[in-house]
Amino acid sequence: MVRAKRKLDHIEYALSTGQSRTHGFHDIDFVHQSLPNSSYETITCETKIGELSLSSPIFINAMTGGGGEKTLHINEQLAYVAKHHNLAMAVGSQMAALKDESEAASYKIIRKVNPNGIFFANLGSEATVEQAERAVDMVEANALQIHLNVIQELTMPEGDRDFTGVLQRIEKIVLNSKVPVIVKEVGFGMSKETMQQLASVGVTAIDIGGQGGTNFAAVENERRQRMLSYFNNWGIQTATSIIEATSTNNNLSFIASGGIQTALDVAKAIALGANTTAFAGYFLRILMEDGIEKLVDEIDLLHTDLKFIMTALGAKTIEELQSVPLVIKGETYHWLTQRGIDTTHYSRR
């Protein structure tokens, strides 16, 4: 019951705290192309995460489940939207259903709505190999997300305080999983060193989950009597974290998430090196405040606008979009310079 109540708290406070932190994409400018040699009608948006083929570089990221009828209804609606647009979708952490079988329906509903969809199971880094297998089976998942949420746990009144052995547990899950494993942050970004560690144990896909979207430190602080306000602005901005990711030179697939709300955000994230992008809080707010049809329409517009931007840049495919020239400036440039990451190749390609 405590876990289910927490799930509902997360929805309430995620909506009330909003997405007030900056994601850094304002520091990224495309180099205008006056002769793009492109046509809107020939633009294609297919992409891949590892060996998973996706029809769109936009997917619905992990949000909820395990909070009774309300979370079941949210996942049901999101699965409908995913089916309508042929988008991949992740569920929220399934530990609630592993601890209480009665909560499993709030996750299983996605397969009932969209039997042939691409879905990602989701567990925290405390999960065992056996729990990972059960989570995958629960939703007949095509991949498994393992989320890293140290700052959220530390801020959570009842959260974990021991994070030893996490990399070793992830390695065991990777070695034993029958589906690809995606390791994701939850809004605090990832450094290049973290991604190198993950690659060293066999992880092949990473969701950088940068600062700029839903602020889980602020969410958990709303549930505390004594706020840990020093965590509210903690983390690496989304744009910066994508560049940190690509600087590792590992054969990894990268998912950009963290405050992405517009087609321009999507285009910039991909041009920086992401293979795809993920939306969570922005989609949840539209769904809860304006309804499912408004969300369907918004995703239509995102795809239309992305193709307009790709046409303007002369990028006919997602792969070509990853190679267009851009300029990195401001705080993002300053951070990357201090971190010893050369950005000149972005502007000269």
UniProtKB/Swiss-Prot annotation:
Role of this protein: Involved in the biosynthesis of isoprenoids. Catalyzes the 1,3-allylic rearrangement of the homoallylic substrate isopentenyl (IPP) to its allylic isomer, dimethylallyl diphosphate (DMAPP).
Q: Which residues form a coiled coil?
A: none
Q: For this entry, list what GO says about its biological process.
A: isoprenoid biosynthetic process
List ligand-binding residues for FMN: 62-64, 93, 122, 184, 214, 258-259, 280-281
Localization in the cell: Cytoplasm
Source organism (scientific name):
Bacillus thuringiensis subsp. konkukian (strain 97-27)
Question: By its UniProt entry, which PANTHER family does this protein fall under?
Answer: ISOPENTENYL-DIPHOSPHATE DELTA-ISOMERASE (PTHR43665:SF1)
Which Gene3D superfamilies does the record match to this protein?
Aldolase class I
Catalytic function, reaction form: isopentenyl diphosphate = dimethylallyl diphosphate
* Quaternary data: Homooctamer. Dimer of tetramers.
UniProt cross-references to InterPro entries, sorted A to Z: Aldolase_TIM, FMN-dep_DH, IPdP_isomerase
Give the SUPFAM superfamilies listed for this entry. Answer: FMN-linked oxidoreductases
Binding annotation for substrate: 6-7, 152
- Quote the protein name from its UniProt record: Isopentenyl-diphosphate delta-isomerase
**Amino acids binding Mg(2+):** 153
